[in-house]
């Protein structure tokens, strides 16, 4: 996958939960922008739902599906990979906002990174199995984000 590959067909659903400060997150995530970031990381057509949630929902999903009782930045629920990728990407707004602040990034830049990261997961990339796969995924994220004009997220 190279950054100059044409954008793939993406059926995107973008959802926001109700939580304090949701307007900031809506402003950072206009539909066209989210569509561009995700499409850029796709190797094939996709149907993807992106849901921006509060800490309570993020923690509940992480606990129920990963058995980790805390809110994490992003969860990827991938259902099919071929011929069309179908997935739900759930991002926890308070965690994303805190991490962006701690890492000295804009909210937009951190969301771009996490959406590219989650889209790669939805296509089978993994960084938790072994170091080689982790380095491959990280290098691809850096390349894709650079082509979207974002700095190295690491």
Swiss-Prot record:
<dbReference type="GO" id="GO:0008270">
    <property type="term" value="F:zinc ion binding"/>
</dbReference>
<dbReference type="GO" id="GO:0005737">
    <property type="term" value="C:cytoplasm"/>
</dbReference>
<dbReference type="Pfam" id="PF02130">
    <property type="entry name" value="YbeY"/>
</dbReference>
<feature type="binding site">
    <location>
        <position position="117"/>
    </location>
    <ligand>
        <name>Zn(2+)</name>
    </ligand>
</feature>
<dbReference type="InterPro" id="IPR023091">
    <property type="entry name" value="MetalPrtase_cat_dom_sf_prd"/>
</dbReference>
<dbReference type="InterPro" id="IPR002036">
    <property type="entry name" value="YbeY"/>
</dbReference>
<feature type="binding site">
    <location>
        <position position="127"/>
    </location>
    <ligand>
        <name>Zn(2+)</name>
    </ligand>
</feature>
<feature type="binding site">
    <location>
        <position position="121"/>
    </location>
    <ligand>
        <name>Zn(2+)</name>
    </ligand>
</feature>
<dbReference type="InterPro" id="IPR020549">
    <property type="entry name" value="YbeY_CS"/>
</dbReference>
<comment type="similarity">
    <text>Belongs to the endoribonuclease YbeY family.</text>
</comment>
<keyword id="KW-0255">Endonuclease</keyword>
<comment type="function">
    <text>Single strand-specific metallo-endoribonuclease involved in late-stage 70S ribosome quality control and in maturation of the 3' terminus of the 16S rRNA.</text>
</comment>
<dbReference type="GO" id="GO:0006364">
    <property type="term" value="P:rRNA processing"/>
</dbReference>
<keyword id="KW-0698">rRNA processing</keyword>
<protein>
    <recommendedName>
        <fullName>Endoribonuclease YbeY</fullName>
        <ecNumber>3.1.-.-</ecNumber>
    </recommendedName>
</protein>
<keyword id="KW-0862">Zinc</keyword>
<keyword id="KW-0378">Hydrolase</keyword>
<keyword id="KW-0963">Cytoplasm</keyword>
<keyword id="KW-0479">Metal-binding</keyword>
<dbReference type="GO" id="GO:0004222">
    <property type="term" value="F:metalloendopeptidase activity"/>
</dbReference>
<keyword id="KW-0540">Nuclease</keyword>
<dbReference type="GO" id="GO:0004521">
    <property type="term" value="F:RNA endonuclease activity"/>
</dbReference>
<keyword id="KW-0690">Ribosome biogenesis</keyword>
């Amino acid at each position: 996958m190279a950054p100059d590959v044409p954008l793939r067909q993406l059926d995107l659903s973008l959802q926001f939960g109700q939580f304090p400060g949701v307007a900031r997150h809506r402003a950072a995530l206009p539909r066209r922008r989210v569509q561009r970031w995700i499409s850029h990381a796709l190797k094939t057509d996709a149907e993807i739902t992106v849901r921006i949630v509060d800490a309570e929902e993020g923690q509940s999903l992480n606990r129920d599906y990963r058995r980790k009782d805390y809110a994490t930045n992003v969860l990827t629920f991938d259902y099919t990979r071929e011929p069309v990728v179908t997935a739900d990407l759930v991002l926890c707004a308070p965690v994303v906002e805190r991490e962006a602040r701690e890492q000295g990034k804009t909210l937009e830049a951190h969301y771009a990174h996490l959406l590219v990261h989650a889209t790669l997961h939805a296509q089978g990339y993994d960084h938790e199995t072994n170091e080689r796969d982790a380095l491959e995924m990280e290098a691809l994220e850096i390349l894709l984000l650079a082509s979207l004009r974002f700095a190295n997220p690491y």
